[in-house]
């Protein structure tokens, strides 16, 4: 519209100049009368403005035909929507449970009806979760006799529990609070634990517990959305950090597998003694540390309306079957099969004829492209090809059946009230309640300005050490993954003051090991407390470990200004080649 409006303004201004220079001709066209213009001239102006606006838009679009093809084949996550996400809490009927119940990855949760049509948004869990016959009854912060801060976790147990069938090697917990408190809790549990004690009802004194808390969300199996085999894990880690930091507010309680719990146990307590005192003004309770929580994402299976194709047309718009509600969008095309049982291979797999498989492969392939429509929705187009299309031998009655993954788009946040997730999709043997602990996020779309695709190609062609040249390069690299326009994310990036690196060597088991020591100077005022800084540093350390050359290790050191405090991370080794 801005191109069209600009052309219309130009034509109106040019018409006024023409009327002053040629009043007789202007009178014949009514150009000199602003309120009574000739309707045929108006239509001519509008048509010319539309055509020239389209031409100007094409000149300004930075040749997406070149960049989108390369980016979609090598790094498809840069072109995909990041759907709405949230964190849900399952509440089983734990007093009646005898053993854990596992909720598989992809378990569906529905929202209450929202919007004019009463649509229920469908969310799926991003990882499996074990519902234990436990309840976290109380979380209390107190001071020990020696002046140290102690966090007491009291778990209530089902007295029907068969402890031989319960695996307590890890118990995930979620820090359910605003960012400053959640980050402070996360830091206290993962970086500030001095010792742990266990107390059970029949014991007079508490006993030492060889346990600890570890940070969750950084593992290869912790991705929020489906990974493409072509995508580099480190890039997804950055996108997840900037778009849904709640994912990293999970911690894992470890060490209880060594404890022999007696039958009929009613409760047990764990005292977590902190190495440094809890100096924050805010307190927390069991409302802020939750059990049986898992992230969910607004993705669900769909089918497309059948497509009738011919060899003369290669692009087709896709529409979800029976879903014309004005908000459902297609996330991915998972499979394409023709009415003659011909399987179409994804073009990116290079398993079609002429690709890596040469002559022993499918004759057909498909590719997808996303374009933003006039309504604001992102529409998916299917592009088909192969030898049959090149030779025009596609059967006339050929139709395609497609399996899709869809999303509800912006509907979860368009409702006047916050969307509530409170219904499980599948029935289970036990009674389970569910609720969302945070408001569903808005979907994030790839940036469409500032030559984004060209910046992506420039970044992905750089080496690991080039990121460490200066603070501006690192800020620019991280900004490629900040799609939310969040003020807090902008402040975190601007807080990067300086970046230095130097080579380091050490001997390990008789071998010389080479690495890189990276020093990042941060302005502490750009973060919501020390816990926020530690989470940012952990993200950087993990990303550098994934991105670094395979023969190097890296060690991150963060220097805080204005205090000059140094935070050091353990050295990490690359386990795969980025790309």
How does the language model describe each region?
Residues 110, 265-275, 398-405:
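Short, aromatic- and glycine-rich surface loops/edge beta-strands on solvent-exposed regions
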Residues 1-203, 217:
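Extended assembly-interface regions of large multimeric machines
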Residues 2-3, 10, 22, 47-58, ...:
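Short linear motifs embedded in intrinsically disordered, proline/glycine-rich low-complexity segments
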Residues 144-146, 263, 395:
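Surface-exposed coil/turn segments at beta-strand junctions on protein surfaces, enriched
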Residues 51-59, 77, 138-148, 154-167, ...:
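Extracellular ectodomain segments of secreted/surface proteins
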């Amino acid at each position: 519209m801005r191109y069209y409006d600009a052309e219309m303004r130009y034509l109106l201004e040019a018409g006024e100049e023409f009327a002053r220079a040629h009043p007789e001709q202007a009178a014949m066209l009514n150009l000199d009368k602003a309120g009574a213009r000739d309707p045929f001239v108006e239509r001519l102006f509008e048509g010319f403005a539309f055509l020239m606006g389209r031409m100007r838009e094409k000149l300004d679009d930075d040749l997406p035909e070149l960049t989108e093809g390369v980016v979609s084949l090598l790094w498809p996550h840069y072109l995909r929507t990041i759907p709405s996400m949230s964190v849900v809490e399952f509440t089983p009927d734990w007093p009646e449970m005898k053993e854990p119940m596992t909720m598989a990855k992809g378990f569906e949760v529905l929202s209450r009806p929202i919007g004019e049509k009463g649509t229920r948004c469908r969310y799926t869990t991003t990882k499996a979760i074990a519902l234990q016959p436990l309840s976290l009854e109380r979380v209390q912060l107190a001071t020990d006799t020696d002046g140290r801060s102690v966090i007491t976790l009291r778990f209530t147990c089902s007295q029907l529990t068969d402890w031989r069938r319960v695996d307590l090697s890890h118990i995930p917990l979620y820090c359910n609070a605003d960012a400053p408190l959640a980050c402070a809790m996360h830091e206290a549990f993962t970086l500030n634990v001095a010792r742990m004690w266990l107390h059970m009802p029949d014991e007079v004194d508490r006993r030492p517990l060889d346990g600890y808390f570890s940070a969750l969300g950084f593992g290869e199996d912790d991705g929020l959305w489906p990974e493409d085999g072509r995508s580099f894990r480190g890039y997804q880690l950055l996108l997840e950090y900037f778009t849904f930091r709640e994912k990293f507010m999970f911690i894992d309680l470890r060490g209880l597998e060594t404890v022999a719990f007696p039958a009929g146990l009613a409760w047990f307590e764990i005292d977590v003694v902190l190495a440094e005192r809890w100096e924050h003004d805010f307190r927390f309770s069991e409302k802020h540390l939750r059990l049986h929580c898992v992230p969910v994402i607004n993705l669900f299976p769909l089918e497309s309306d059948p497509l009738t194709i011919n060899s003369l047309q290669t692009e087709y718009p896709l529409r979800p079957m029976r879903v014309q509600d004005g908000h459902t969008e297609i996330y991915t095309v998972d499979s394409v099969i023709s009415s003659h049982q011909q399987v179409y291979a994804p073009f990116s797999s290079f398993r079609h004829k002429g690709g890596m498989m040469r002559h022993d492969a499918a004759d057909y392939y498909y590719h997808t492209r996303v374009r933003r429509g006039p309504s604001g929705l992102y529409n998916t187009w299917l592009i088909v090809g192969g030898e049959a299309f090149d030779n025009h031998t596609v059967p006339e009655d050929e139709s395609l059946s497609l399996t899709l993954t869809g999303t509800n788009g912006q509907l979860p946040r368009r409702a006047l009230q916050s969307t509530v997730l409170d219904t499980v999709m599948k029935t289970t043997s036990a009674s389970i309640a569910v609720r969302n602990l945070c408001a569903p996020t808005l979907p994030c779309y790839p940036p469409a300005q500032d030559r984004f695709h060209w910046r992506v190609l420039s970044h992905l062609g750089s080496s690991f050490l080039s990121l460490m040249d200066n603070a501006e390069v690192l800020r620019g690299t991280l900004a490629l993954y900040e799609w939310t326009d969040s003020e807090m994310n902008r402040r975190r990036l601007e807080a990067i003051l300086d970046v230095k690196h130097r080579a380091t060597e050490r001997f390990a088991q008789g071998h010389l090991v080479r690495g890189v020591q990276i020093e990042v100077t941060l302005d502490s005022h750009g973060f919501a407390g020390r816990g926020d800084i530690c989470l940012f540093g952990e993200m950087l350390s993990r990303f550098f470990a994934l991105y670094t050359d395979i023969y190097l290790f890296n060690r991150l050191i963060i220097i805080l200004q204005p205090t000059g405090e140094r935070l050091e991370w353990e050295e990490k080794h690359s386990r795969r080649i980025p790309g």
